[in-house]
Amino acid sequence: MPFRLAVDYDGTLFQGSWPKIGEPKWDIINKVKQFKEEGAEIILWTCREGISLDQAIQRVKEVGLEFDAINDNSPSQKEYMKKKLEQGEEFATRKIFADFYVGDDAMNLDIFLSINVSETCRRFENR
């Protein structure tokens, strides 16, 4: 299963200015792009919904970010959950599973920026 990274929008990818769309935080955006290039699955993990979510999605596309899921589990996690259900295990949950949750509240962004992307993704490849 690939490394899964869940990233918040307001205050993390973009300056916090809810409900407005803030300015890009390029250091974080570029780090997320590095994870994507290394094969990680990227999840946009935000409390935004409706029109404000649509605006946020449009803005992340404009800065060149691609997400494997938006407020949902990654494709590999969904496949894993499907297999568990087929084996008779109860595996229904609304929880979004990720290896790292990056947000202005969840992880110090300076620590996130210091992570070695290649090494981190490689460590999670064979679990």
Regions flagged by a language model, labelled:
Residues 41, 53-127:
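C-terminal cap/substrate-recognition subdomain and adjoining C-terminal extension
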Residues 1-76:
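Alpha-helical substrate-recognition element adjacent to the catalytic core
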